[in-house]
Amino acid sequence: MPPGEGLSEKGVSEALALRTALASEEVDLGVATPLLRTQETLDLALGERQVERVVLPALREIGFGAFEGGPLAEYRAWAWSHPPDAECPGGGESRTEAAVRIAGALDALLDLPEEVILAVSHALPVRYVVDASDGSFPTARITPVPHAEAFFLDTDAVRLAAETLRAWAAAPSFADLVA
């Protein structure tokens, strides 16, 4: 069984709503992270479609280190007061490390032969990709993304997101960072 907790009742409802939202959309491949809840979301969203499903570890959530499993507010307080290249205490990832990893995941998706890919990930990777798909750099205080909501990005937007994340990671800063 994959690691992590499965979907809550609300999560199941959200994944089923995603299935309805995607009912008329073509999907050639489904991609999830190693965590059980993303795989369950993907399976529910795809329903009975005969679509290959794969796990792409590089799409996982940021490594929270010492904050893993604790209140998200504690991680946010730390993140809002440290630069993006600061290593997260307890062996976690810096935001720049996560951005480079996510850019690599996008490259891997772009290299696949399938044209339409449904990728299920986590809050920070999704926000970073959506923002970077229009050339925007990540912010310290990310705007939350709704659970199980579809964001439609074409190949050019995904390529721009990967390039933008790498460019930001090479010279990281947060305009909204509290010193």
Predicted features by range, described:
Residues 1-49, 78, 91, 96:
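Active-site-proximal alpha-helix that buttresses catalytic centers in soluble enzyme cores
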Residues 5-6, 45-104, 161-164, 178:
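Phosphate-handling substructures
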Residues 23-26, 109-116:
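Glycine-rich phosphate-binding loop signature in dinucleotide/nucleotide-binding domains
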Residues 25, 55, 62-73, 131-179:
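Acidic, low-complexity terminal tails and accessory targeting/binding regions
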Residues 32-33, 100, 120-121:
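Short beta-strand scaffold positions
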Residues 36, 59, 124:
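Catalytic metal-binding/acid-base residues of hydrolase active sites
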Residues 44, 128-132:
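Active-site signature of alpha/beta-hydrolase-fold catalytic machinery across serine-
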Residues 115-123:
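Generic beta-sheet signal
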